[in-house]
C-alpha cells in the first residue's frame, strides 16, 4: 500500500476527471481549467453564500446550529432547488472560489481558495478564521493540518488562501488502507475533499460517495 499513499499527476487528473463527470451530472459546477500551455491545470468551483448573522448556502440551507460531522462523513445532504434565498438583498453575499491543484512537491492535491464580497472587497485571514466552524477550528489548530495560510497561486500568480498539504498523506493513508482492507474502490479526490472541504465551508453532496460505489459495481 506504500506506493498508493501518494498519487502522481496523471492519477490526480484521472481522479479529477471522474469527479467532474459526476459534478456535471448533478449540476455541482466543478470544472477543469487548463494552464496556458495546457500541460497541467486545476479543478475550480465558484460558490455564493449569504452572510446574515449565520452563513447560508446559495440554495438557502442555513448552517446556523449545524453539528460537526466526522471528517470522513462530511458530505452535504441534497437540497431542494426551490429553496432559493429571498432575503439576499438584505444580506451580504460572499463569493467563494475553490481551486484543487496538484502539488508536485508533496504528490497530493491541495485546496486553494479565496473569498470576497460582491463589491470586490476581499475577506481577510481573520474573516476566514471567523467563518470556520468551532469544531473544525480546533482540529485545524491541533492537526492534521498546520493552519490556513495565504500563498501565491502557482498557476495564476495571485494571492489565495491554502490548506497546507504537508499532513495530507498522514490523514489520507488510513482512508486508503481501510478501503483496500474492505476491497472498496474510492476516488482520492472525493475522500480528500470530504475531509478538508468542510473546514472552509465546502461540503460535497452525498451522491459523490454513492457515485464511487456505483462505478465500482459497474467494473466488469
UniProtKB/Swiss-Prot annotation:
InterPro entries: Atg3/Atg10
Localisation per UniProt entry: Cytoplasm
Top enzyme class: transferase
GO annotations of cellular component type: cytosol
Positions of the catalytic residues: 166
Alphabetical UniProt keywords: Autophagy, Cytoplasm, Protein transport, Transferase, Transport, Ubl conjugation pathway
Catalytic activity, EC: 2.3.2.-
Entry's transmembrane regions: none
Single GO molecular function: Atg12 transferase activity
Cross-referenced Pfam families: Autophagy_act_C
Gene Ontology BP, a term: protein modification by small protein conjugation
Keyword Cell inner membrane part of the UniProt annotation: no
Record carries keyword Heme: no
Domain of life: Eukaryota
Subunit record text: Interacts with MAP1LC3A. By interacting with MAP1LC3A, it plays a role in the conjugation of ATG12 to ATG5. Also able to directly interact either with ATG5 or ATG7. Interacts with IRGM.
Family in the record: Belongs to the ATG10 family.
Function according to Swiss-Prot or TrEMBL: E2-like enzyme involved in autophagy. Acts as an E2-like enzyme that catalyzes the conjugation of ATG12 to ATG5. ATG12 conjugation to ATG5 is required for autophagy. Likely serves as an ATG5-recognition molecule. Not involved in ATG12 conjugation to ATG3. Plays a role in adenovirus-mediated cell lysis.
Protein name, UniProt field: Ubiquitin-like-conjugating enzyme ATG10
